[in-house]
Amino acid sequence: MVTIKEIARMAGVSTTTVSNVLHKKNARVSEQTIEKVEKLLAENNYIPRLGLNALTNRSSRIICILITTPEFARGSAYETPFYGNMLGNLERLLRENGYYIMIFSDKNVEEIEKMTVGWNVDGIITISMPYRHLKKIAGLSDIPIVSIDMDEMPEGDEVYYQITSEDKSGGKEMGRYLIGQGVKRIVYLANVNHGADHLRFVGVREAVREADYKVLLEEKRLPKDYTQREKCYEDFLKYVGTDTALFFSTDVNAAEMISFLHRNHVKVPEEISVAGMDDDIFASIVYPRLTTIRVNVEEKAQTAVDILLKLIRGRNVEKNVYKTSVKLIERESVKIKSLNT
């Protein structure tokens, strides 16, 4: 296997220059030298010896991504479109900056803690980790940490670097949209009653309170088990034909509900409206296509990577809490109010 020293000799440059090209530290390297070194690296099939760096005190170029598997997940977190989309964006962005990812997901936070201190990583990105666990992990080392969608965060606590969506605004925007279509009842269905799911409900509740006419609002928590969820869905068949909208905290469950309604010969949206949140892959492939709130996953990932790289490089980060945009995506699953009514 060719070494950095051999590449440097062939290119007529120092090993430091080759290392800078490898790690995308190109500020002091000319374009001509970069092209020359990259060509030699490709021609000689150079493979970085990352494993050695990970076991020493040197920079490993590895970023650890810690995922707290949601309690409502059927299996691993990776089965959920949101996590797959987020991981794909993080991997691409970090690779473009010369870093590699190590992923660890578990419902057992103690296992995650062991993972944190067991490897020499340059930084950590957590996804959906409860505040109390993030606080504990942050106290185990000085490794820079950025949190995406921190759960159970105390109000006003801005100690840790965190990225989240405008969940409350998203819920309110959907609530206003549904009310604008003349619904008389909104049923909000979520997997949990805290974190993003709860904030989305708070937004819907505000929209209902500000409505020009009386709108009934119900909040339901979805069972973890699929069979139990089916029984839960049966309860809402009584609302067919009553100007009701079922607003789910995730598109996955909204698509599941539409499938259930089809099997029970209920027409969506003619007899009942269904809406979701996230705008994941299910929103555009289910029939009818789902009206939803788009959560900008790419913006979340980009913001997290930008902040983490600043922390790793010792640069100033302007603030601790960043909120990314949301957007109403109108498709065909909500009954549109007639202009004649």
Residue ranges, per PLM feature:
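An alpha-beta-alpha
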Residues: 172-213, 320-334
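Short, solvent-exposed amphipathic alpha-helices that sit
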Residues: 78-96, 170-173, 195-215, 256, ...
